[in-house]
């Protein structure tokens, strides 16, 4: 009997020790799998490497928005992993003019030195040309330091400077790779799956993923309801060694059928962008585009730079790019948000894209600042919702102005639209508040929705008033009524797409009143 009891006791003791050992081994392995960077799984022959939890924020894309955001959040102490498809210097024909309002945001983010040593040019306003007449519109900069002005430059040089500055921060990791998808679990974005430069499939995880992979984003569909429109295309040229009629000014020619833009991008180069309405373009390869530019566009170019324009066409370096517009319509997704052109686009006529992006980054930085720990998904989601609301007044004003101004500047066979175009040019030529007000909107110095609407309809009323002086007629009254109707038909659909309540009455939306989190609410749950 005694030996049997002894054997049972030994079995129980051995079982207990083995169970304890197995439990400890399992615990160590689970801890190791969570903390070791680069644990490997092989599925269907594809190598997937899952990164550890040493990242606070993943940024997809390192263009203007992504690079500026990486530096901003890195400077705030966040551990940032940036994944960019191509880290070589970009070569684009847009994103070359930063409005004064955007430059102020650049200063606020501590990135103003990124426009130094790249041969950037100061921009002090615009010159408008129409039917042989011209008017100069200066930015209202009297209340600002002498350094504050617009800046124009090679986009790639500017982006590279910001990338370099972000990369200098020890907590920012810049990696070349192509993000193929967002990693989602139970409706929450956990990170991204991407291919490295060498073709290796990797996954990276973080509490927050910010997608800013540009106008051709392949990730936006899961984070917003994209309604992309392409009203026109830009045809880009570089004019060399020529002087613009008004130095340090952007030049807008109200041509037929659409605007032509000129602005300096270095001390010896001038960018020309010819807007071509619709989706169909003359062929560049066949020479049809060059013929179109020489015969249809060149006669409308100011005489001082016409020879340089023709010379640029003959050199043959003609590039095109679709002009996209897309109102912001986010899908609130825990763990992720959109930024930059991936989220919101407007016609580039007014050069407002970088101003919107930099303004968004300032808002996002200030919202995330009190959140010590981003792993609290509920708290983080509330602040992302606040971001989408707080950005609306500024972004929507710039977006609406770009869309409305482009439609007004288009030539049209309709008498009412043509009268609106003439009224706009003459209204801006009046000077005083009639020019400083709209230019303050355009420059991002006073992006107020109500001011935009007031000036837009002031142009329409100015046009109607001219029709009724000295004596009104039935024909002129009818034309005036159609002019008001045309103006309404231009601006109201844009405002509706942007969101009337968010644009004009944001304070009626609870998300705008988001108090800083208490220490307990910002700690992980």
Curated annotation (Swiss-Prot):
> Which family is annotated?
Belongs to the squalene monooxygenase family.
| Full protein name | Squalene epoxidase 3
List the subcellular locations. Membrane
Q: Name one GO molecular function term.
A: flavin adenine dinucleotide binding
Q: What EC identifiers does the entry list?
A: 1.14.14.17
Cofactor(s) listed: FAD
Q: Please name the Gene3D superfamilies in this protein's record.
A: FAD/NAD(P)-binding domain
Q: Where are the transmembrane segments?
A: 9-29, 452-472, 477-497
Xref: PANTHER family: SQUALENE EPOXIDASE 3, SQUALENE MONOOXYGENASE
InterPro entries per record: FAD/NAD-bd_sf, Squalene_epoxidase, Squalene_monox
Its annotated function is as follows: Catalyzes the stereospecific oxidation of squalene to (S)-2,3-epoxysqualene, and is considered to be a rate-limiting enzyme in steroid biosynthesis. Can produce not only oxidosqualene, but also 2,3:22,23-dioxidosqualene.
Q: Is the keyword Oxidoreductase assigned to this protein? A: yes
Q: What does UniProt note about where in the body, tissue by tissue, this protein is expressed?
A: Expressed in seedlings, leaves, stems, inflorescences and siliques.
Biological process GO annotation list? response to jasmonic acid; response to wounding; sterol biosynthetic process
Q: Which UniProt keywords apply?
A: FAD, Flavoprotein, Membrane, Oxidoreductase, Transmembrane, Transmembrane helix
Q: What would be one Gene Ontology cellular-component term for the protein?
A: membrane
Chemical reaction(s) catalysed:
squalene + reduced [NADPH--hemoprotein reductase] + O2 = (S)-2,3-epoxysqualene + oxidized [NADPH--hemoprotein reductase] + H2O + H(+)
Q: Which organism is it from?
A: Arabidopsis thaliana (Mouse-ear cress)
Q: Which Pfam families match?
A: NAD_binding_8, SE
Q: Which residues bind FAD?
A: 64-65, 84-85, 92, 163, 179, 341, 354
Q: What class of enzyme is it?
A: oxidoreductase
Topology in the lipid bilayer is annotated as: Multi-pass membrane protein
Pathway listed for it is: Terpene metabolism; lanosterol biosynthesis; lanosterol from farnesyl diphosphate: step 2/3
Look up keyword Aminoacyl-tRNA synthetase and say if it applies.
Answer: no
Site feature Important for enzyme activity, where: 126
